[in-house]
Amino acid sequence: MERMGLNEIREEYLKFFESKAHLRLPSFSLVPKNDKSLLLINAGMAPLKPYFTGLQVPPNKRVTTCQKCVRTGDIENVGKTSRHGTFFEMMGNFSFGDYFKKEIIPWAWEFITEILKLPKDKLYVTIYEDDDEALDIWVNKTDVDPKRIFRLGKEDNFWEHGLGPCGPCSEIHFDRGAGEVKTSEEFVKASDEDKIVEFWNLVFTQFDKDEEGNYNKLANPNIDTGMGLERMATIMQNVDTIFEVDTIKAVLDKVCELSGANYKEDRVKDISIRIITDHIRSITFMISDGILPSNEGRGYVLRRLLRRAARHGKTLGIKNTFLHNLTDIVIENCYKNYPELEEKREYIKKVIKLEEERFDETIDAGMQILNDYIKEVKNNNHKVLSGDKAFKLYDTYGFPVELTEEILEEEGISIDKEGFNKEMKEQRERARSAREETNYMGSEDTILNKIDLNINTDFEGYDKLEVKSKVAVIIKDEEFKNGMEKGNEGVIVTYNTPFYAEMGGQIGDTGIIYNDSFKAEVIDCKKNISGKVLHFVKILDGKVALEDQVILKVNEERRNNIRKNHTATHILHAALIKVVGDHVQQSGSYVDDERLRFDFSHFEAVSEDELKEVEKIVNKEIMKANAVNTKVMNIEEAKEQGAIALFDNKYKDDVRVVSVGNFSKELCGGTHVSNSGQIGMFKIVSEAGVAAGIRRIEAVTAFKAMEYVDHKNNILKEAAQILKCNEKELLNKLNHQVLEMKEKEKEIEALKLKLASGAEDEILNNIREIKGVKVASAAVKDIDGNALRDLGDKIRDNMQSGVVVLGSNYKGKVLFVAMATKDTVAKGVHCGKIIKEVATIAGGGGGGRPDMAQAGGKDPNKLEDAIKTVETVVESLVK
C-alpha cells in the first residue's frame, strides 16, 4: 500500500468508475434543490433522490460523484474528539436500474486491492445475515478470504428509512490494529473500539417497504454506494485522524502559525485548533454555494459555524480577524476539483471578514453581559440561565444559542431551552420570515410530480405565442382525470406549449387554451420536479378530454411586458458590475409584467450617485437599441466568452446564452425582447438591504416607468401648489419652512421645560420616606426624554439623598426615568430593577444602572398606575 494524497484518491475513484461506463458528475451544491426535507446536502446520494424515486430521468443509468457534504448534528463533539467534523466529501457510484450486486461487488474489490492496493489481510467484509446472494458473489467472484466475511443483523447491514425503497448492504472495513478476528462478536467489539473501521458501504436497494411492513421486490433494483474521502485518506496516509490528512493538516498548520500554538501540546488549545480547522472548510464551501450568514435556516448554520470558529480564535489569543486568511489554504488544496472556489475566492473572503468584523463589534459587549449573567446565576446558587436572557444574547448581540451553551457548559451552567424556544417562536410570529422560492410546483409526493416521465412537454414559446397540440394529462382535485367541464379548475398538460413555466425568477405565462367546443383560462404556468409544463386552468366554457386537439395562446401584452423586464434585469446586472464592482453576483431575482426585482451581493448600501450612474447606463444601453441574441453553446465556451452564470446553479453541457449587444452576456432560459430599444425606459424605484451582504433593487420599465415618473411629477406639482411657489423654488421654500418649524419646536420645548420646572416644587413637596430612603415620584405631561431627565436631575440634586422616578405621556408614548443618589444605592436601591417593574405595567420595558435607568411604555392610560407602584418596588429593594 503506497501513500496517496486526498486529491489523488478522489481522482482515482472517479476515473475507475468512468472506466466502468459511469458518467462523472460534478458535486452538486450544498443547497438542496427541490428538497424541503433537507437544510444542507449531507450525503452523497441526497441530490440524486429524484433519480432513485423515478421523479426525474437520470442523465445516465450509471453515475459517479464526489459530493461535498455538511453535517452539524453532532457539532458539539467537533473539536472535542479528533473523529468528528462538519465538512466531508462522499465518493459514490450509483446504478439506476442498471447493474446490481454481481457487478458492484467485484468492482469494489478490484478498486481497493488493485488501484488503492490495500493489503487483503487487512480487509474485512460484512453482509446482511439473510443475503446469501451477496455472500455467494463475495466468495466466488473475488478472492477475499471467506473467514473475513461476517453476517450481521438488520441494525448493521440493512438500509431503510421509513417506507419505500430499502435493502441490504455490504460494508468493507480496514483493520487498524485489531489483529486476527474470528467471530462476528469479536468483529463488532473491535469495530466499537475503532480498531476496525468501515470505509465503504454498498447499498443494494432491492425492496419497497409498504405500510403493512411487507418487503416487495423492486422491478428495477438500484445501487447506492458511499465511501468517505477523508476516512479513506486516513487509511492511505496511515494517520489516526482526519486532522492529519494532507489537505486538512495544511489548514491546521496555518491555524497554529496564526495563533502561535503547537498542536498536541495542550488539550484545551487542541480543541480550539480542531474546531477552527474543521469549521473554515464548511464555511468556505457554504459561501461558495451562495449561502450567507443570517438568523434563519442554512444561513444560521453558517453564522453559527463562523462565530464559533471566531470565538475559538480569540481563545487561542488571535486578536484580529483571521478566518478569511485561512480560506486561501482551503482553496489552494481544493480548487482543482472545485473550480468555483477559485472563481469566488475574493467574494468568500469578503463575506467571512465582514461577518467576523460584525461579531467583533458585539462579542465584547455580549461577553460582558454573559459574564454578568453567569455571576448572577452562581450568586443565586442556580444552575440554569433563563431563556429570555439567552435569547437577548442571540437577538441583540448575535450569539448563536449553541455558542452561549458552549460557554456556559464550561461554567457548569445550562440554558432553559424551552424558554429560549418560546422567545424565538414569539419573534418569528412578529416577523415571519420569507419562504424560500422554489422552481417547481409542490412537494415531492404531490400528484403533480407523478406524471408519466415518458410524456414530453416541449416549449416552443421563444418564437411562438400560439401553437396547436393535444391534451396529454388532466388533473383535478389531486386525481388524474379523463376530462373537465365548465366551472372546473385543475391542471392541463399538453405535448407542446408556447407557455413559459415559472423558472429562473421569471413568472409563468397566462392566456387561454381552446378549441371549437371548449375554452379555458390559463391562470398560471409552472413546472413539476421532472420539468413537465403544468397549465393551471379554469374551464370557462364547454368540456375538454384527453387527446383533444387544442390551441394554446399566450397573453401577448403580458408576455411582452415580462420580456422587457427580464432583459432590463440582465442590463441592470451588467451595469451594477461596472459601477459597484465585479464582486456583484446575482443572488435572486423576480420578473413579472409590472416590475423587476434584483438581489445581488454587496456589503453596503448603494449610494445615490451610484444608483444614478447605474440607471443612466441602463437607459443608455436601451437607447442604443442593441440586438438581443440567443445562442446555444457548450458551457465551457460560454464561460470563455465571459457569460455570467448563476451563483449556485449546475448547468448541462449545452447552455442558452443571452447577449444584449456587447454589454451583457448571461446564461438564461427566459424570454427576452429582440432589441433593447423595445424596453423603452428604465427607472429604479428602490434599493435596500434584504440580508447580510445582500442588496435589492426594484425597478420598472416601459409604460410603468413613465407612470412612475408621472406620479413623482404630480407630487412635485401638488407640493408646489400647497407651498404657493413654482417647482424651481420648491426646495428653497421647503428648507425655509423646515427651519421655521424647528424654531417653533424649540419655543414649544422651552415652554414645556418651564412648565416642568413649575412641577418641580410640587414633586419636592410630596416626598415620602420608605425605610429611611426618600422617594419622589410623579407623572408629568407632554415632556420629552431630554426634559424628563433634566427635571429628574434637578429633583435628585435638590433632595441630596433619595430616589426619584418620573413618567411622562409624550406623543402617545410613555417615557420613564429613575435616578438615585449613591447612599441610597448602598442601601439596596437599583434604578434598573425599579424601572423594569414600573415600565412593565405600562406595556413596556427597559433597564439600566443602579443609579440611573430609563424605559419606555406603550399604554399612556397605565402611566398613573405604573407610578403608584414605585413605593412598593423601592420597599422591596431597601435592605
From Swiss-Prot:
Its EC number is 6.1.1.7. InterPro entries: aa-tRNA-synth_II/BPL/LPL, Ala-tRNA-lgiase_IIc, Ala-tRNA-ligase_IIc_anticod-bd, Ala-tRNA-synth_IIc_core, Ala-tRNA-synth_IIc_N, Ala-tRNA_ligase, Ala_tRNA_ligase_euk/bac, DHHA1_dom. Binds 1 zinc ion per subunit. Pfam families: DHHA1, tRNA-synt_2c, tRNA_SAD. It is an enzyme of class 6 (ligase). GO terms for molecular function: alanine-tRNA ligase activity; aminoacyl-tRNA deacylase activity; ATP binding; catalytic activity, acting on a protein; transferase activity; tRNA binding; zinc ion binding. Zn(2+) binds at residues 566, 570, 668, 672. Its cofactor is Zn(2+). Keywords: Aminoacyl-tRNA synthetase, ATP-binding, Cytoplasm, Ligase, Metal-binding, Nucleotide-binding, Protein biosynthesis, RNA-binding, tRNA-binding, Zinc. PROSITE patterns: AA_TRNA_LIGASE_II_ALA. It is found in: Cytoplasm. It catalyses: tRNA(Ala) + L-alanine + ATP = L-alanyl-tRNA(Ala) + AMP + diphosphate. Disulfide bonds: none annotated. It comes from the Bacteria. GO terms for biological process: alanyl-tRNA aminoacylation. SMART domains: tRNA_SAD (SM00863). GO terms for cellular component: cytosol. NCBIfam families: alaS (TIGR00344). Consists of three domains; the N-terminal catalytic domain, the editing domain and the C-terminal C-Ala domain. The editing domain removes incorrectly charged amino acids, while the C-Ala domain, along with tRNA(Ala), serves as a bridge to cooperatively bring together the editing and aminoacylation centers thus stimulating deacylation of misacylated tRNAs. Catalyzes the attachment of alanine to tRNA(Ala) in a two-step reaction: alanine is first activated by ATP to form Ala-AMP and then transferred to the acceptor end of tRNA(Ala). Also edits incorrectly charged Ser-tRNA(Ala) and Gly-tRNA(Ala) via its editing domain. Belongs to the class-II aminoacyl-tRNA synthetase family. This is Alanine--tRNA ligase. It comes from Clostridium botulinum (strain Okra / Type B1). The gene is alaS.
